[in-house]
A protein has these predicted regions:
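Hydrophobic N-terminal alpha-helices or hydrophobic patches in metabolic proteins across all domains
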Residues: 1-280
């Protein structure tokens, strides 16, 4: 059933606008505000984060426990699908990067800086245009990872509760209304990112330049303190072996190549999940 959910999620992601209608974060942000408004919780931020995160996770686990024994688990299928779709990232990075691609292709550096800040949240004080391109490349890899790969990884490994936990922590780590809870959520999210980020780096090596990735990043693979975003940005750059960039078509081609690397990695992951489902 897990692989069926993964296939349905992929179809919804690619061919439906249902995800945007499902993803409503108001209830979670409101609950964070309620927990953060209690002085005892802000004085003990780890306790506050646990009080915020555990109730929705326990409720989901209870519902799954009730529904899975009924009708061979078919009643749990819609719930799992709903949870995984909600847990996917917000927005569409490929669409968001479109104006940057257009400006870069026109060799409009000033316009590229503007749309990168406006649409991608990238703020770079760069002396060279290639520095901006490298940051946008890293943003593309990170957004694709946190929006899709990490959620799918945790769902396949530990089920919908883990996928939901990842997105709850991600939203808590990115909100600015409860800074104390945000700091603790970011630390816990770093732990959640450690394993799937390394798995994606290994898949980059398998579908890209294996020798370059292993030579350049072997030491960082086991380093706990290396941020996932930085590791993935370096891995994507090395796996595609970008030797040329700069304004114009070559820079845009590097973004296209990076996206194709992500697509090949997704195909590899789905193939692994399919084999896993057959063997279990």
């Amino acid at each position: 059933m897990s692989f069926l959910v993964l296939l349905l999620v992929l179809l919804i992601e690619k061919f439906s606008g249902w995800r945007a209608r499902v993803q409503r974060d108001g209830w979670w942000l409101g609950w964070l505000d309620a927990v953060g408004g209690v002085k005892s919780m802000t004085a003990q931020p780890w306790l506050g984060l646990l009080v915020a995160v555990l109730p929705p996770l326990l409720l989901l686990a209870l519902l799954l426990t009730i529904l899975e024994p009924v009708a061979y688990g078919l009643l749990a299928l819609p719930l799992q699908l709903l949870v995984v779709v909600w847990s996917l990232g917000r927005g569409d990075v490929l669409r968001a990067i479109g104006p940057f691609r257009d400006a870069w292709r026109r060799e409009d550096a000033q316009g590229a800086y503007h749309v990168a800040e406006r649409d991608l949240g990238v703020q770079v004080q760069a002396d060279r245009d290639n520095d901006l391109l490298a940051v946008v490349q890293g943003t593309l890899v990170w957004q694709a990872y946190q929006a899709f790969f990490a959620v799918i990884f945790w769902y396949a490994l530990l089920g919908p509760v883990a996928a939901l936990a990842y997105r709850l922590l991600a939203i808590a780590a990115e909100q600015d209304r409860q800074p104390v809870l945000r700091e603790r959520a970011a630390q816990l999210r770093h732990a959640f990112d450690w394993l799937p980020a390394r798995a994606l780096v290994l898949s980059f090596a398998l579908v890209g330049n294996f020798v370059a990735v292993t030579r350049m990043l072997l030491h960082d693979l086991l380093a706990w303190d290396v941020p996932a975003a930085r590791l993935l940005a370096r891995a994507g750059y090395v796996a595609e072996d970008f030797n040329e960039g700069g304004l114009g078509a070559k820079g845009v081609a590097s973004l296209d190549a990076l996206w194709q690397l992500l697509v090949r990695s997704a195909v590899l992951w789905y193939a692994v999940f399919a084999i896993w489902a057959l063997l279990l």
